[in-house]
Regions:
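Long, ordered, helix-rich scaffold segments
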Residues: 1, 24, 41, 55-69, ...
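Active-site-proximal structural scaffolding
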Residues: 2-3, 19, 37-41, 48, ...
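Glycine-rich, acidic and aromatic/proline-enriched surface loops and short helix-turn segments
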Residues: 8, 12, 16-19, 46-54, ...
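Short linear loop/turn motifs
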Residues: 24-28, 87-92, 98-103, 194-213, ...
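Gly/Pro-rich turn-and-neighbor structural signature
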Residues: 161-184, 188-192
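Sequence context surrounding c-type heme c attachment/ligation sites in exported
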Residues: 186, 197-272
Length: 272
């Protein structure tokens, strides 16, 4: 059983069956002397995890197993499952249609949703977002529970566009009028309440809001603790949406909306 485990571990690490040479080097030869079996297993595990064939998924021949590896890493951030390995062993991944069928199966797995959500979080700059601090005097009803609800609302918004909206594409992320609200958020924004606390239902906000760029969580994240920040939001849009780089500012400037005339537009304030 120890030898069988060692072989299976190396095959899982390499995401394909071992060749005869690999079988000898990574498994059989490690049990050739009289050292304890546990030491042999440790040695095999370390050798496998240090091998370029584990560290570099594209290393090796392009075949069904490499297709299985690309699917698993691309959709799950993981290794191929048993179904993928069986399909690769049977040579059922060598055409686009066969690979597409496996991809559709994998998209129904919760791991695909988790992978895509993480991708969105990195794109939006919220993967490692710290707590959003707000002025308690200016926003007395803002607390950590409300912040958690805002983040949940954003996640549900993304899920609804990607997984539940037929024919949706990237544009829908930017122009959808749908904003998931629970009772607490509805009360905070003065919108129509949903029936049960904690249940996020659909709501259509005012006509000035649409899509990700006006979602309350992102607006709260890319702003100061007591005021708006068109600079932070502009940098976010430029870098994360338009994909353009920005030079460092010539000097540190703090934008304070109340220092400008109320008759000025936001564009005029930022330009000045």
């Amino acid at each position: 059983k120890t030898r069988e485990f060692s072989q299976q571990f190396a095959e899982r690490a390499f995401r394909r069956p071992l060749t005869a040479e690999q079988q000898l080097f990574f498994a059989d030869s490690r049990f050739a002397d009289s050292k304890p079996a546990s030491d042999s297993v440790k040695e095999i595990v370390l050798l496998s995890l240090k091998s370029p064939r584990f560290l570099y998924p594209d290393l090796g021949q392009a075949d069904d197993y490499s297709v299985a590896t690309r699917l698993a890493i691309g959709l799950w951030d993981s290794m191929p499952d048993d179904e993928l390995l069986r399909a690769a062993a049977a040579g059922r991944l060598n055409t686009p249609d066969e690979a597409r069928q496996q991809a559709l199966r994998m998209l129904r797995d919760p791991r695909s949703r988790a992978k895509l959500r993480n991708t969105f979080h990195h794109w939006l700059g919220i993967a490692h977002a710290e707590e959003i601090a707000k002025d308690t005097e200016q926003y007395p009803n803002y607390d950590k529970s409300l912040e958690a609800d805002l983040r949940t609302s954003l996640n549900i918004f993304l899920d609804n566009i990607v997984w539940r909206t037929a024919g949706a594409d990237f544009r829908k992320l930017l122009n959808s009028r749908h904003l998931p609200l629970n009772e607490r958020l509805a009360g905070f924004y003065g919108a129509q309440r949903v029936k049960h606390l904690g249940e996020f239902g659909p709501s259509f906000f005012d006509h000035e809001r649409a899509g990700l760029l006006t979602h309350p969580y992102l607006l709260a994240l890319y702003s100061y603790h007591n005021s708006t920040s068109p600079i932070h939001r502009g940098v976010f849009v430029t870098r994360h949406v338009l994909g353009r780089s920005l030079k460092p500012p010539p000097a540190a400037v703090v934008f304070k909306d109340d220092t400008f005339s109320p008759d000025m537009t936001m564009r005029e304030k930022v330009t000045q």
